[in-house]
Amino acid sequence: MADKKRYEELINILDQYSYDYYVIDNPTVEDAEYDQKMQELLKIEEAHPEWVTPESPSKRVGGEVLEGFKKVEHDTPMLSLANAFNRDDLADFDRRIRDKVGDDISYMCELKIDGLAVSLQYENGKYKQGATRGDGTVGEDITANLRTIRSIPMKLKKAYSIEVRGEAFMPKRSFQKLNEIREEEGQMLFANPRNAAAGSLRQLDTKIAASRNLDIFLYAVADFGEMGVETHSAGLDMLETLGLKVNKERRLCSNLEEVYAYIDEWTEKRAGLAYDIDGIVLKLNNLEQQRQMGTTVKSPRWSIAYKFPAEEVPTKLLDIELNVGRTGVITPTAVLEPVRVAGTTVSRASLHNEDLITEKDIRIGDTVLIKKAGDIIPEVIKSITEERTGSEKPFHMPKNCPTCDSELVRLEEEVALRCINPKCPAQIKEGLIHFVSRNAMNIDGLGEKVIIQLFSMHLIKDVADLFFLSKEKLLELERMGEKSVTNLLASIEASKQNSLEKLLFGLGIRHVGAKAAKSLAVHFETMDNLKIADKETLTSINDIGEKMADSIVTYFANEEVHDLLEELKRAGVNMTYTGPKLENMSEEELVFAGKTVVLTGKLEKLTRNDAKALIESLGGNVSGSVSKKTDVVVAGSDAGSKLAKAEELAIPIWSEEDLIEYLPDEGGLNE
């Protein structure tokens, strides 16, 4: 019988885990432990729905489908900021401040996050409502979608009733992954992380918002004075004590020279941030002085946003090449004269699809403007038409696949052209490269160049052929000596023991990513069970939507897939889930239960992944950084700063041999 006290305890534990991971960026547990606690919580909620509150961590995963977004009136208007584009604008702003309140001033300088301004309401410390800025007076209610952002606490550390303002955003890495998925699926790409964040928060299906990995920084309260603080900087510190995520890169500046230094610093460093910023915000720090300055109808007189100039670089578009992805999507790529953009040299940029090329009237031979979307992905902004000479050539997508000559099609609701020939050599080659990649079967020594050689020499035609390669055939490859071939064959052999989720992800089933593959493997345990699953069963699993379920059913209905799986079985490839199931182990077996272990340096007998998997299978958590919460540091050769920090904190340091003694005998390691 479920215990309500245990239920409340689980909520507090999961809230703390989320705070550690998403707010202060100091994870204290591994995903497996978090997932285990969440599953326990979900089982209790299923048995006792009357206990569930809006603050439950289970509400973060989405699932609610909204009918629309109702209007919300802000108690205090969400004003926009006036802009400064140069130092003269900042000097004028500073002069107006000094003329009004005198020279005893300071400015809190903060990074201007390029996202979507939102408002969060807490009542007695509990998250009540979230809204967009809208026109500043009336916004849209996006309470459910904001709840899916893990860095937004559902309960504050104190029972305040406050309205907090902040910027929701999509980290660069999440943006890149999202666009890669959308491109593979033939969907329109988001132009930048800001648009992606805004689009995600306006999804009627909250599961979609939850899948987008959004984040937030909070930067103000509707009225800081209600919190008993006298300065904006003290107010930000107070927000942190409440468990809210505030950007750490803020600085209190006493004069304009310090402000300029801060701007110069972040103009240089912004490309290295994990999120987009488009400027610096200055705020008069003293709250009483803010009140003296007042506001205009649109913006406060005590704050201003300095906007970074956009880095747009001209270069020549030499050609447009076509690439065929593993799912058949045809992607046009701009071949450019190499040019430096946002810190790196760019020679190629995706043009995404034919519609975009037509819309922007991009021609071969044009001088084009280049920037990096999210400071990561090279993007052609536009052609500089006034520099055309008449020699430029319009581009037209072909009607047939550039690799296999099959007719290209545009599927319903897709903007991309796609080759649907399952025997297309380009798709097979890309599928092979994906199959051996690190997140899939992780076969060391079998990189893209080796795959291309094997494929072009007709030594492999599908993924099963990899497991029947002989030493003699591999020695025929360029730059493959005796030692390289021996190591490669050992790596191929070792990959046969991978757990089911690795194989599933490697097979490249459309719409099935690494996370979904893990969910499928854990649920079905064997490939045979998964093969016969129907759509209803599949959609009952977390992370599996209707589109993905349809794709899985279609995939396993293919006779060629059945033949491929039989060949993989014949090769000895494991088709069962072999990951840790902590709930089935005794306390005596879980020798690392509750302990955090850090691995550093080069291990001789174990690979890093093997050591991590073994520690986790015995209840331990493997962390990437050393802190006071670390229980053991395992140091191999060439250990660096982590070892030094462990010594400084007096944390026990083990050798690899010490670790092996604590582990079960795996493949003769203890001999």
UniProtKB/Swiss-Prot annotation:
It holds the Pfam family DNA_ligase_ZBD. GO terms for biological process: DNA repair; DNA replication. Its cofactor is Mg(2+); Mn(2+). Coiled coil: none annotated. It comes from the Bacteria. NAD(+) binds at D31, A32, E33, Y34, D35, S80, L81, E110, R133, E167, K283, K307. InterPro entries: BRCT_dom, BRCT_dom_sf, DisA/LigA_HHH, DNA_ligase, DNA_ligase_CS, DNAligase_adenylation, DNAligase_N, Hlx-hairpin-Hlx_DNA-bd_motif. GO terms for molecular function: DNA binding; DNA ligase (NAD+) activity; metal ion binding. Zn(2+) binds at C401, C404, C419, C424. The active site is at K112. Signal peptide: none annotated. GO terms for cellular component: cytosol. Keywords: DNA damage, DNA repair, DNA replication, Ligase, Magnesium, Manganese, Metal-binding, NAD, Zinc. Its EC number is 6.5.1.2. Residues 587-671 form the BRCT domain. CDD domains: BRCT_DNA_ligase_like, LIGANc. It catalyses: NAD(+) + (deoxyribonucleotide)n-3'-hydroxyl + 5'-phospho-(deoxyribonucleotide)m = (deoxyribonucleotide)n+m + AMP + beta-nicotinamide D-nucleotide. Belongs to the NAD-dependent DNA ligase family. LigA subfamily. NCBIfam families: dnlj, PRK07956.1. DNA ligase that catalyzes the formation of phosphodiester linkages between 5'-phosphoryl and 3'-hydroxyl groups in double-stranded DNA using NAD as a coenzyme and as the energy source for the reaction. It is essential for DNA replication and repair of damaged DNA. This is DNA ligase. It comes from Listeria innocua serovar 6a (strain ATCC BAA-680 / CLIP 11262). The gene is ligA.
